[in-house]
Amino acid sequence: MATRHQVRQSVVSLLYANEMGSEMEEFSNEFLEEKKIRNDQKSFTLTLYNGVLDNLNLIDEALDAHLGKWKLGEIGAVERAILRLGAYEIKFTNTQSAIVINEAILLANELGSDSSTRFINGVLDAISKVN
């Protein structure tokens, strides 16, 4: 069974693929099966993924308010996906902000650029303080 961290990795991958224009319905099913994400974990993955997409405008507004000199479109696609997932979980789920931020930092270390960890930490921490 996949861990919640592996689920979040998959959500970031799906958000990235969606932004790159992949045919998502077929891709997501194949991708999740390949990652052995099934049953409750698949449901959790799709809940997070669809939650981000359904609330994308609100999430992007929250992110824009805390990006400082950056614009969301100037940030790398992987980092943007991590930020969107983190902001969604902080704003729309009952998961503790500290857990969400820690997971986002782990994802940034694994998937993002070298400088993204501190940036993602700062943005999500600022959002958590407003929420």
From Swiss-Prot:
<dbReference type="InterPro" id="IPR035926">
    <property type="entry name" value="NusB-like_sf"/>
</dbReference>
<keyword id="KW-0805">Transcription regulation</keyword>
<keyword id="KW-0889">Transcription antitermination</keyword>
<dbReference type="InterPro" id="IPR011605">
    <property type="entry name" value="NusB_fam"/>
</dbReference>
<comment type="similarity">
    <text>Belongs to the NusB family.</text>
</comment>
<protein>
    <recommendedName>
        <fullName>Transcription antitermination protein NusB</fullName>
    </recommendedName>
</protein>
<dbReference type="GO" id="GO:0005829">
    <property type="term" value="C:cytosol"/>
</dbReference>
<keyword id="KW-0694">RNA-binding</keyword>
<comment type="function">
    <text>Involved in transcription antitermination. Required for transcription of ribosomal RNA (rRNA) genes. Binds specifically to the boxA antiterminator sequence of the ribosomal RNA (rrn) operons.</text>
</comment>
<dbReference type="GO" id="GO:0006353">
    <property type="term" value="P:DNA-templated transcription termination"/>
</dbReference>
<dbReference type="GO" id="GO:0003723">
    <property type="term" value="F:RNA binding"/>
</dbReference>
<dbReference type="Pfam" id="PF01029">
    <property type="entry name" value="NusB"/>
</dbReference>
<dbReference type="GO" id="GO:0031564">
    <property type="term" value="P:transcription antitermination"/>
</dbReference>
<dbReference type="InterPro" id="IPR006027">
    <property type="entry name" value="NusB_RsmB_TIM44"/>
</dbReference>
<keyword id="KW-0804">Transcription</keyword>
